[in-house]
Structures are given as structure tokens and as C-alpha cells.
């Protein structure tokens, strides 16, 4: 039996080889905390003293949480996901990452959750990078004035409360007054710009659904898909059954996706539907985290909640690429009270508001825009010259009409001027009515409003105004296409175009038939008389003899 001998040199070489092959990169420091209290989508965690504000924490099972309250000894965390399996005593680990979402063109045509994860069953999304949710808005020197129009396709808005690229225009009104429809029509109206392939015209859209029913979100997606608008739109969905944390971060996730395009020199549009539900979710989170309540139980920083979100909408300077992000926040009022806390906050932040009134909606005026309380602080700077020239008197005429309409309800006798004003106002209201999901191109809007403000439809019965408008616009497109081309080409309404418009509407009136079967123009123009057919007669004139002085 041979004896086993161990040489010290072999042991030394083996140890040296092992030490040389050891990789120390896998070693690191990991902070581990524990759940102290959990419930209602909130967890209080202790043992993570180096956690940052808005840092993501990882619970057992891979559920993420957002650190909002950094207190002495514990952290108040909002759970982003299913909280049923989180129990007291479970381990919680730091991720060292601030909340961010993936961004890029791969999100166009997709439906994602507030963390950027696809929920439409169409597979993974190839992202171009990530963008933090909490980023500083563009500074004053990084912006430029809003001066490029963003057409909504809605006559009442483009004429009276114009929206420009980089503007923040609030859509406010009671429930079921058409707020979402206005926003969806604006997205659909960008379809022709997208089809043009011109990056300076294309507008990429983001629709953020906050606290809505899943069936409603599905309906919006179907509407966009049927209209061919989903190809350039991203839907960020935080339905009503999602935790409050998702509803809180959804608008920031949508704006991060849109800001990626803005900072790349492109144009984007984002719709927040609606911020009232985000404020309610933030109120619930703040109360559960035991933050001091203020007016209507909202926390003291609820103004900052919306201001830091909406200030991200901007028209960037040319040095930064000239990109833009236009925001359409939606706020729901109760009993048309626009003086409530959240509505007044958002009104003071935005560049104007479109107020939709339930009374007008119930009267069949759709979109139900209240002209008196709707305003755009950008105004004519975001309008083409053609639209500005025809829409100048529209707001004044409608405001006077509403005032006279209320006065005439008392049964008072009115003079002819007042009756004429009422008649024209009723026809203007009919002209501004518009079917759902059928935005008008800008050239058709200009011709329609020109016909109304110049009194060309004053002789058309109110019941026939909308049919007259539709058929006349089609007639111009067939027989006077040069009018549309001139409006689109120069952006102006020159004297030659107005002259051709007068000829076109006069010719169309001669062939238009009212709903009762009678022609609009009752008598055809009389043909000139043939001189040979005129019979000349001489009439004898008998003069009395002159009187003499003797006869006097």
C-alpha cells in the first residue's frame, strides 16, 4: 500500500490558482427591510434607511412599491400591483432605481399599463430607452411662444377657442357631456397629417385613461382603430379596478412617453381622461399615508400634483429641435360648478378651457360648448389667417344670440334688428353642430363659418341648415375645388376666393330643395326682353289754349 504524500508546493499552487480565478463582481451590499403594516394598497416598511424618494422597492413575489413617505424609522410605500399576498414580516428589498417607463415608437398602436407593460396581448414592445416619471419640465429659456395651430376638426373649437401646438387646453364639464368625444375627435383629426408622412405635420398621440371602466376603454380603442387613428396613438390604461397607485402615476407615465418624442424634435398630443380621478386617487393615498388633509380633504400639495404634470407640455425652442407636446386635460365637474377646488386649480394652470354644458347637450347642441365661459389664452396666434378672418364675429354673434334668447323667453316684443339677430344666431348654432367622430378639415370649416357669419344662410330654414351646409361643402369640393386649394395653399381668404364663394353659393341656392320639396329660390331670374317684341304706342297729348290777360 503506497503512502499518500502531500507536497506544500502543490497546496500553494492550488490556492493561488483558486484565488486568481475568483471573481469579486458578484459581491455587493443589499439592504433588506420588513413590512410592518399593510392594507388598502399601502405598506409601511422599516429597515431601509438609505431609500430615495420615488424609489422602487421590491416585495416578495416580485410586486413593486413606490416609496412616497420617508419618515424616521419607516417608509410609507404605495403598492403597484396585487397586494393580497403581501403580509407583515415579509422581506422588502431596495432596487436602487427611480420609477421609469420604457419609451419609443414601438408604443404606437399599443395599449399599456402605467408601468409601460403591454396589456393588449400583442406581444412585447421593443423600447428605445427608458424615461423617469419625475423629470423637471422645460425651463423658460427652453420654450418658445405657441404659434402653430393644432386642428381639432371641431368647428366651434378651431374658430373660437383655437388650440396651438404646445398649449394646455382644459376640457371641463359634467359627466356625459361629450368631454371624451372632443378629445377623441382631436386625435382622429390628426389622421391626414400622419398619412402625409411629413414629420413637421405628424402628431403622435397618447391617450391616458384614469379610473374608467374597462368597457369604456375598450370602446375608445375600438373607435380609434376603426377610424385609422390607433396607428399613431398609445393608450395608457389605469382602469377603475386598479390600485390607487396606478391611477396616481398613469398621467406621469403617459407624459414620459410623449416627452420622448417632444425632445426628439417631433410633435405629440396627450389626453388626460380625467385628472379628477387622479386627484381622488392621490387624496386616498395621502390620507392612508397620514398626510395632513386640507380643503375637501385633499393634501396640501394637490396643486403641485397637477402643475408639475401640465408644465411638461411646451413648444421647445429651435435650439432643442422645436418639438412640442400639447396637453388636453379633462376635469369632471358636479352640477356645472367650475369654482370647485380641483377645477379652479387646473383652470389656473392651463392656457384656456372648453366648458361643456349639460343644458346645451340636452338641447341637442353637440358639442355642447358654452361660448361665454370657454376661452383660449393663445387665441388668434394659433389660427390660420383664413379662419381668423371669418371667425372674428362668430363669438360675439353667438354671445348676443344667447342673451337675446334668454330675454325673448319672457315673451317681450322685439324689434326687427333683434329678430334678425335671433334668426342668424339660431342658424349659427345649427352650423356649429357636428356628428361624433367626424372631424372637419380646416378648409371646409372656413367655408362653413364664412357662410354663417356673412348671412348667406339667413334665408335657409333652421331645419334645413345642416343639410344645406353638408351639400354645399360637397358642391364646392366638386365644382369649385380651387376654393379649398386656395385656403390650404395660402392660408388666406383673398378677394378672388370670396368672389368665387359668392358665385358658388348663389348657384347652389338655385338648385337646393327644402325638406318640404319646395325650391329655396322661388323665382328664376327674369330673362331680358327682346327689343323687337316691345310694342311702341304713341299717346296724344291735349294742351289747353293759353289764357290772355283780357280773359283774366
Swiss-Prot record:
Region of interest called Disordered, as start-end residue ranges on this chain: 526-552
Query: Which reaction is catalysed here?
Result: ATP + H2O + 4 H(+)(in) = ADP + phosphate + 5 H(+)(out)
GO MF terms here are:
ADP binding; ATP binding; proton-transporting ATP synthase activity, rotational mechanism
Q: Where is ATP bound in this sequence?
A: 173-180
The free-text function statement in the UniProt record for this protein reads: Produces ATP from ADP in the presence of a proton gradient across the membrane. The alpha chain is a regulatory subunit.
Q: Where in the cell is it found?
A: Cell membrane
Q: Does the keyword Nucleotide-binding apply?
A: yes
**How does this protein assemble?**
F-type ATPases have 2 components, CF(1) - the catalytic core - and CF(0) - the membrane proton channel. CF(1) has five subunits: alpha(3), beta(3), gamma(1), delta(1), epsilon(1). CF(0) has three main subunits: a(1), b(2) and c(9-12). The alpha and beta chains form an alternating ring which encloses part of the gamma chain. CF(1) is attached to CF(0) by a central stalk formed by the gamma and epsilon chains, while a peripheral stalk is formed by the delta and b chains.
Root EC class? translocase
Stated membrane topology is: Peripheral membrane protein
Q: Which family does it belong to?
A: Belongs to the ATPase alpha/beta chains family.
EC code(s) of this entry: 7.1.2.2
Q: Which PROSITE patterns match?
A: ATPASE_ALPHA_BETA
Q: At what residues does the UniProt record annotate the site feature described as Required for activity?
A: 374
Q: Which GO terms describe its cellular component?
A: plasma membrane; proton-transporting ATP synthase complex
Skewed-composition ranges (Basic and acidic residues): 533-552
> What is the name of the protein in this document?
ATP synthase subunit alpha
Task: Name the UniProt key words of this record, in alphabetical order.
Answer: ATP synthesis, ATP-binding, Cell membrane, CF(1), Hydrogen ion transport, Ion transport, Membrane, Nucleotide-binding, Translocase, Transport
Taxonomic source organism: Frankia alni (strain DSM 45986 / CECT 9034 / ACN14a)
